[in-house]
C-alpha cells in the first residue's frame, strides 16, 4: 500500500473549526476553556502565576475546577533508553553496589534499546487523552516517563522537558499536583473500602487538615465513585479472599488517588482485566473527571468502539515514536490523507493498532510502514502545532514560583508528620492482624494442636536417666517449633505486603522507619500470644520443673525465641525479592544456627572457622538458658536411678555435658535481646535499600 505524504491536512484555522464541531466533544465549553487556560498560564503577570498555584481546598470533586487552577501538561524531546546487557561482563563488588544505592548513583551504561524516540505531546485540561499502540510500543514507558517513575535501569535523556502550564517541573513538583493510577491494584486484603480510604486520606491530605475534613472527604469520594454500597466490604484478594469486584477495585484505586483532588491524573491500563461493562463504567468515571476540568492521560491497549468515542484526544505510539496525536476526527482525516482510511463500520482503535503493529514474518514491511506513518505525522500541521505548544515551556515564566511550598507538604516531601505516619501504619497493621483469620485464629489453633501433640508424646516425664534425656529433647523442640513456625509465618505475611509498601513508599505516603516500626509493633502481641499458648499447654503435660518462677522463666525464654525468629523472618523477607525466594532461603539459613544450638553439636566442638557464626545462633543461648532454668536447682539425689551400675546424673553433670555454665544465664538473655535488635536493624536496612533501589 502506497502512502501519499504530499497531501496536507488543511490550515490551522480550518482544523480548529473541524475540531470544535466534532461529535466526540463532550461539551461546548472545552475547546474555549482549554485555549483560555493555556493563554492564562503564558502571561508574565506574577500575580496570575501565584493565583495558578495557590493552595486549593479539598472537596471539589463535584464542582467545576476554576479556570485559574486548570493544568496543561506538555512534554518535549522525551528519549528513553534501556540498560545495556551485562552478559560476559564482571559484576560490580557488593560494596560498590551498596555504595551506589546509598548515594543514588548508578554506573553509566551503553544504551541497549531506544525505547522512546523524541516524543513530544500536550494534554490539556478538560481532555481525556488515550495513549494507544500495540504491545511493546512504549505506552507504559511513556506514562512512567511523564510521571517521573521510570524503573531502575531506564535512562531518560537530560534534554527532556516536562512542564505544567508552561513551567518546567521536577518529580517532587509534579507529584504534588498529579495522581498516578498504576495497572496492578495493590491493597491490604483484610481492610474494608472505607478503612483503606481513611488510611490514604490521613497520609495524603495535608498535615494541617482536620481529621473531620478528611473523613468528610472520604465520604464524598465514596459517593462520587459509586463505592458507597461496598464501603464496609473487605477488599479481598482475587482467587484467595472474596471481596470487591474487578470494577470496584479499579474505582477504589482511582478513589485513593483523587482524595487530594489532583488536577492531573495518569492511568496505566485502567480497563485491564475488566469486562466490557466494567471497562465502560471505569472510563465513564474518568470522562466525568475530565468534563469537570481535570487533565486525564491514560494508556489503553485496544478499546472497543464505544470506549473509543469517549476519548477527546488519542496518542498513537509505535516503535517508541509518535504516529499521531490529535482528536479522533483528525486521526480519521490523517489516515485518509495517507491513503489508508479506516474501513466503514470498523473500530478505528482496532484499525490503528493493526496498522502500527509488527506482524510475524512481515517485520521489515511493517517497520517500513510505521516509519512512513510516523515521518508523515512529524511534518504535518498537527505535529507542528503540538510542537509549538510544547515549546513554550519556560518562556516568560518565573520558575521560582513553581518551587513554592505546596499546602500540607513538609520540608521532607511528606504530607503527614512522623507520628501520624506511625499511628496510621500501626492502626492499619493492627486491623489486618485482627481481621485476617490466617494470622490469629488459624495460628493459635495450629499452636494449640502442635503443643497438645508434643505434650502427649512427652507426657508425664519423671526425673530419671531416661527422663533427663527426654526433657532435654522436649525443651530443644520448644525452640525448634517456635523458630520454624514464626519464621515462615512472617515470610508468608510480610513478603506478601512488600509490594504494597514499595508502591506507597514511592508515592511518599510514609517513611521506611515508620512503616517498619508500626508493622512490627502491631504484630508483637501475636508473637507473645503464640508462645504463651504453646508453653502453657506443654509445660504441665511434660512435667517440667514445678514452681511459678520456673514456668514464667521458661515462658519468657520461649517468647524471646519467638521474637528472635520473627526478627530473622523479617530479615529474610526484606532481603529476598519474592515470597518463593524467601521460602527457599529460609530453611537452609536456619539449619546451621540449629546445629550450633548445643543439642546436636557440643558448643566446645564447633570448628574454629564456624565459631563466629555460632555466636548468632539463638538456639545456643536459649537452649542454655532453658536447661539452666530446668536443672540448676535440682539437688543431689532428686534424680532417681532406675538401672543398676549406673551413676545417677546431677544438675552440674547435665549442664557440663553440653558445656553450659549457670553463671552464663544473664548473658544468654542479653544475647537474645541483642539478636532481636540486630536482626531487626538488618531487616530495616534491607528494606531501606530496596525502597531506594525502586526510586
Curated annotation (Swiss-Prot):
Record keywords, A-Z: ATP-binding, Glycoprotein, Membrane, Nucleotide-binding, Pigment, Transmembrane, Transmembrane helix, Transport
Main location: membrane
Biased composition (Low complexity): 19-29
Single GO cellular component term: plasma membrane
Keyword Transport appears in the UniProt entry: yes
InterPro entries: AAA+_ATPase (IPR003593), ABC2_TM (IPR013525), ABC_transporter-like_ATP-bd (IPR003439), ABC_transporter-like_CS (IPR017871), ABCG_dom (IPR043926), ABCG_transporters (IPR050352), P-loop_NTPase (IPR027417), Pigment_permease/Abcg (IPR005284)
Disulfide pairings: none
Localization per record: Membrane
PROSITE patterns: ABC_TRANSPORTER_1 (PS00211), ABC_TRANSPORTER_2 (PS50893)
Residues the record lists as binding ATP: 133-140
Role: May be part of a membrane-spanning permease system necessary for the transport of pigment precursors into pigment cells responsible for eye color.
Name used for this protein in its record: Protein white
Originating gene: w
Amino acid at each position: 500500500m502506497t502512502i501519499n505524504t504530499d497531501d496536507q491536512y488543511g490550515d490551522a484555522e480550518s482544523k480548529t473549526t473541524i475540531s470544535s464541531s466534532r461529535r466526540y466533544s463532550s461539551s461546548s465549553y472545552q475547546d474555549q476553556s482549554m485555549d483560555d487556560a493555556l493563554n492564562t498560564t503564558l502571561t508574565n503577570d506574577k500575580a496570575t502565576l501565584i493565583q495558578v498555584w495557590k493552595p486549593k481546598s479539598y472537596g471539589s470533586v463535584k464542582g467545576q475546577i476554576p479556570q485559574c487552577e486548570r493544568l496543561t501538561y506538555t512534554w518535549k524531546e522525551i528519549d528513553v533508553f534501556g540498560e545495556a546487557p551485562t552478559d560476559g561482563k564482571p559484576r560490580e563488588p557488593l560494596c560498590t553496589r551498596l555504595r551506589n544505592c546509598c548515594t543514588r548513583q548508578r554506573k553509566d551504561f551503553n544504551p541497549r534499546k531506544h525505547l522512546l524516540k523524541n516524543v513530544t505531546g500536550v494534554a490539556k485540561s478538560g481532555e481525556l487523552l488515550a495513549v494507544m499502540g500495540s504491545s511493546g510500543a512504549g505506552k507504559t514507558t511513556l506514562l512512567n516517563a511523564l510521571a517521573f517513575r521510570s524503573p531502575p535501569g531506564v535512562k531518560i535523556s537530560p534534554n527532556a522537558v516536562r512542564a505544567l502550564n508552561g513551567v518546567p517541573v521536577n518529580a517532587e513538583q509534579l507529584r504534588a499536583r498529579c495522581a498516578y493510577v498504576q495497572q496492578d491494584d495493590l491493597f491490604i486484603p483484610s481492610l474494608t473500602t472505607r478503612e483503606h480510604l481513611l488510611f490514604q486520606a490521613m497520609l495524603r491530605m495535608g498535615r494541617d487538615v482536620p481529621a473531620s475534613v478528611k473523613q468528610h472527604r472520604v465520604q464524598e469520594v465514596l459517593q462520587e465513585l459509586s463505592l458507597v454500597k461496598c464501603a464496609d466490604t473487605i477488599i479481598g484478594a482475587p482467587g484467595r479472599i472474596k471481596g470487591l469486584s474487578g470494577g470496584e477495585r479499579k474505582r477504589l484505586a482511582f478513589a485513593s488517588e483523587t482524595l487530594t483532588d489532583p488536577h492531573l491524573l495518569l492511568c496505566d491500563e485502567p480497563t485491564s482485566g475488566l469486562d466490557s461493562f466494567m471497562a465502560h463504567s471505569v472510563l465513564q468515571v474518568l470522562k466525568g473527571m475530565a468534563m469537570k476540568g481535570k487533565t486525564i492521560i491514560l494508556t489503553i491497549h485496544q478499546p472497543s468502539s464505544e470506549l473509543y468515542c469517549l476519548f477527546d484526544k488519542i496518542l498513537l505510539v509505535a516503535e517508541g515514536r509518535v504516529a499521531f496525536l490529535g482528536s479522533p476526527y483528525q486521526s480519521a482525516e490523517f489516515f485518509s490523507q495517507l491513503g489508508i482510511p479506516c474501513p466503514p463500520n470498523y473500530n478505528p482503535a482496532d484499525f490503528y493498532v493493526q496498522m502500527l503493529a509488527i506482524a510475524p514474518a512481515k517485520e521489515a514491511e511493517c517497520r517500513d510502514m510505521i516509519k512512513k506513518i510516523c515521518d508523515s505525522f512529524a511534518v504535518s500541521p498537527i505535529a507542528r502545532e503540538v510542537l509549538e505548544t510544547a515549546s513554550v515551556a519556560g518562556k516568560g515564566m518565573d520558575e521560582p514560583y513553581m518551587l513554592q511550598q505546596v499546602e500540607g507538604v513538609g520540608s521532607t516531601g511528606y504530607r503527614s508528620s512522623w507520628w501520624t505516619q506511625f499511628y496510621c501504619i500501626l492502626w492499619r497493621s493492627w486491623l489486618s492482624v485482627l481481621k485476617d483469620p490466617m494470622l490469629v485464629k488459624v495460628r493459635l489453633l495450629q499452636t494449640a494442636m502442635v503443643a497438645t501433640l508434643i505434650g502427649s508424646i512427652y507426657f508425664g516425664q519423671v526425673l530419671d536417666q531416661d527422663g533427663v534425656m527426654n526433657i532435654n529433647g522436649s525443651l530443644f523442640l520448644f525452640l525448634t517449633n517456635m523458630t520454624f513456625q514464626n519464621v515462615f509465618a512472617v515470610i508468608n505475611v510480610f513478603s506478601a505486603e512488600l509490594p504494597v509498601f514499595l508502591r506507597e513508599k514511592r508515592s511518599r505516603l510514609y517513611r521506611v522507619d515508620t512503616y517498619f516500626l508500626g508493622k512490627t509493633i502491631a504484630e508483637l502481641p501475636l508473637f507473645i500470644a503464640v508462645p504463651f499458648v504453646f508453653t502453657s499447654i506443654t509445660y504441665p503435660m511434660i512435667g517440667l520443673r514445678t514452681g511459678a518462677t520456673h514456668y514464667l522463666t521458661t515462658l519468657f525464654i520461649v517468647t524471646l525465641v519467638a521474637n528472635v525468629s520473627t526478627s530473622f523472618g523479617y530479615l529474610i523477607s526484606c532481603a529476598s525479592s519474592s515470597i518463593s525466594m524467601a521460602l527457599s532461603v529460609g530453611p537452609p539459613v536456619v539449619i546451621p544456627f540449629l546445629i550450633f544450638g548445643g543439642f546436636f553439636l557440643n558448643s566446645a566442638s564447633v570448628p574454629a572457622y564456624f565459631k563466629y557464626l555460632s555466636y548468632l545462633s539463638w538456639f545456643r543461648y536459649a537452649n542454655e538458658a532453658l536447661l539452666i532454668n530446668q536443672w540448676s536447682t535440682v539437688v543431689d539425689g532428686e534424680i532417681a536411678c532406675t538401672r543398676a551400675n549406673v551413676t545417677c546424673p546431677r544438675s552440674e553433670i547435665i549442664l557440663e555435658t553440653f558445656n553450659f555454665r549457670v553463671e552464663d544465664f544473664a548473658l544468654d538473655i542479653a544475647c537474645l535481646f541483642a539478636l532481636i535488635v540486630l536482626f531487626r536493624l538488618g531487616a530495616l536496612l534491607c528494606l531501606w535499600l530496596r525502597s531506594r533501589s525502586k526510586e
